[in-house]
Amino acid sequence: MAKYQGEVQSLKLDDDSVIEGVSDQVLVAVVVSFALIATLVYALFRNVHQNIHPENQELVRVLREQLQTEQDAPAATRQQFYTDMYCPICLHQASFPVETNCGHLFCGACIIAYWRYGSWLGAISCPICRQTVTLLLTVFGEDDQSQDVLRLHQDINDYNRRFSGQPRSIMERIMDLPTLLRHAFREMFSVGGLFWMFRIRIILCLMGAFFYLISPLDFVPEALFGILGFLDDFFVIFLLLIYISIMYREVITQRLTR
């Protein structure tokens, strides 16, 4: 009798599911997993094609003509980085490249000229994706101490000092996540990069995420909710990554006030 009741109950559960034979928990887990994978793929490959946004093409065209007339050094003597990457503003190979918080790369002088030339009331919008640029990250080394490089550093610090502390929405923080995490971990494992207190905080965050994954105590236990119970693990790790990106942005802001 008990066996018959159990079979009837399982049939009722199958009838209540959206797809017959597949539980709703599995469907939710599959949908969320595909959404996370799609978001990750978009974040990784959205910067492959660096085409100027149609709304910025006229401004970039005028700026490009001005830069060509003011260019003192020939293209052959420009210091080049990322030989397979071209600056979409000047159409030359990246010279003293600077990366925006949205992950697009430009010549340092080009993005600064784009800021100075345009009539911006606040932070500029990215010439490619139109996302608000609140942070400029240098990709070139600190070896060159020429006057032009020192002036470029000063302009970049000036821009970051003005706009890096602007409030960010949760969606904007998610869009900035790949770029900020890449720079944060690169500095973490480089000599003279991040100070030790910040490195310790990153390590503690990663250890906390690891122990939460292996801990049997969960907000949504796998024993009760099955595969759906793994979603809270991904959510906690995702929040920790956002927290690391926020800390890294604060570190950059603190450097500017020294």
Curated annotation (Swiss-Prot):
PANTHER family annotated for this entry? E3 UBIQUITIN-PROTEIN LIGASE RNF170, RING-TYPE DOMAIN-CONTAINING PROTEIN
EC number(s) per UniProt?
2.3.2.27
Please cite one Gene Ontology biological process associated with this protein: toll-like receptor 3 signaling pathway
Which GO terms of the cellular component aspect does the record hold?
endoplasmic reticulum membrane
Q: Topology with regard to the membrane?
A: Multi-pass membrane protein
Q: What disease is this protein tied to?
A: Ataxia, sensory, 1, autosomal dominant: A rare disease characterized by progressive ataxia caused by degeneration of the posterior columns of the spinal cord. Affected individuals have a reduced ability to feel pain, temperature and vibration, particularly in the hands and feet. Their most prominent feature is an ataxic gait resulting from a severe loss of proprioception. Thus, patients rely on visual cues for maintaining proper body posture, such that they are unable to remain upright if their eyes are closed (Romberg sign).
Outcome, altering residue 102 to S = Complete loss of E3 ligase activity
What the entry lists under InterPro entries is as follows: DUF1232 (IPR010652), RNF170 (IPR038896), Znf-RING_euk (IPR027370), Znf_RING (IPR001841), Znf_RING/FYVE/PHD (IPR013083), Znf_RING_CS (IPR017907)
Q: Where expressed (tissues)?
A: Expressed in the spinal cord.
Q: Which Gene3D superfamilies match?
A: Zinc/RING finger domain, C3HC4 (zinc finger)
Q: Where are the zinc fingers (RING-type)?
A: 87-130
Enumerate the GO terms in the molecular function aspect: ubiquitin protein ligase activity; zinc ion binding
Q: Which residues lie on this side of the membrane: Cytoplasmic?
A: 46-201, 245-258
The transmembrane segments are: 25-45, 202-222, 224-244
User: Which keywords does the record carry?
Assistant: Disease variant, Endoplasmic reticulum, Hereditary spastic paraplegia, Host-virus interaction, Membrane, Metal-binding, Neurodegeneration, Transferase, Transmembrane, Transmembrane helix, Ubl conjugation pathway, Zinc, Zinc-finger
The subcellular localization recorded is: Endoplasmic reticulum membrane
Chain's role: E3 ubiquitin-protein ligase that plays an essential role in stimulus-induced inositol 1,4,5-trisphosphate receptor type 1 (ITPR1) ubiquitination and degradation via the endoplasmic reticulum-associated degradation (ERAD) pathway. Also involved in ITPR1 turnover in resting cells. Selectively inhibits the TLR3-triggered innate immune response by promoting the 'Lys-48'-linked polyubiquitination and degradation of TLR3.
Q: What class of enzyme is it?
A: transferase
- The name under which this protein is listed is E3 ubiquitin-protein ligase RNF170
The record's note on quaternary structure and interaction partners says: (Microbial infection) Interacts with human cytomegalovirus protein NEC2/UL50; this interaction promotes of UBA7 ubiquitination and subsequent proteasomal degradation.
**Which parts of the sequence lie on the Lumenal side of the lipid bilayer?**
1-24, 223
The pathway where this protein functions is: Protein modification; protein ubiquitination
Per its record, the protein catalyses: S-ubiquitinyl-[E2 ubiquitin-conjugating enzyme]-L-cysteine + [acceptor protein]-L-lysine = [E2 ubiquitin-conjugating enzyme]-L-cysteine + N(6)-ubiquitinyl-[acceptor protein]-L-lysine
